[in-house]
Regions:
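N-terminal Rossmann-like NAD(P) cofactor-binding subdomain of oxidoreductases
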Residues: 1-172
């Protein structure tokens, strides 16, 4: 089974974690550089927009448990200072590591793939908008992929439909 880790438990990281837990994926590690473990457990359980996550939560000094799944929790502000073991895929939701060079330390710790929640301009990194260009993904070619940007994810599907059905000569955002 693939093991996931999430760096950055803000809005996007929190919902990535929730999606993985609800699909019974194995999440072994989360990190957020600000706040205490008690605060993050509370923020995972209660969301100001989406309400309470219907799950059982507890924590100790080093981990958060969600529905009997224990997840190591760290508060490191840099990749160089994290302690990472047995994680296959990292989902980086920090908004900070937006270049290949900044993400390389994950691979030095044994991570096989990195998914970044922010766009990265690099021809060796795939910026994917599901429903628009997910067919460009090649697991042998890309070890880092991004989910593009919020603006791109909102605009690209609409632009694709308009362009394919009516045509677009040029535009700007």
């Amino acid at each position: 089974m693939v093991t996931y880790g999430i760096n950055g438990i803000g809005r996007i990281g929190k919902f990535a974690l929730k999606a993985l837990i609800e699909r019974e994926a194995k999440v072994s590690w989360i990190n957020d550089s600000s706040g205490t473990i008690d605060l993050h457990r509370h923020l995972l359980e209660y969301d100001s927009v989406h309400g309470k996550w219907d799950a059982d939560f507890s924590n100790d000094e080093k981990s958060i448990t969600i529905n009997d799944k224990k997840i190591i929790f760290q508060t490191s502000s840099t990749i160089e200072n994290i302690e990472l073991e047995d994680v296959d895929i990292i989902i980086d939701c920090t908004g900070y590591y937006k270049s290949r060079s900044k993400l390389l330390n994950y691979f030095n710790m044994g991570v096989k793939k990195v998914v970044v929640s922010a766009p990265i301009e690099d021809e060796n990194i795939a910026n994917i908008v599901y429903g628009v260009n997910q067919d460009i993904y090649d697991s042998k070619k890309y070890d880092i992929v991004t989910a593009a940007s919020c603006t791109t994810n909102c605009l690209a599907p609409i632009v694709k439909v308009i362009h394919e059905n009516i045509g677009i000569k040029h535009g700007s955002i």
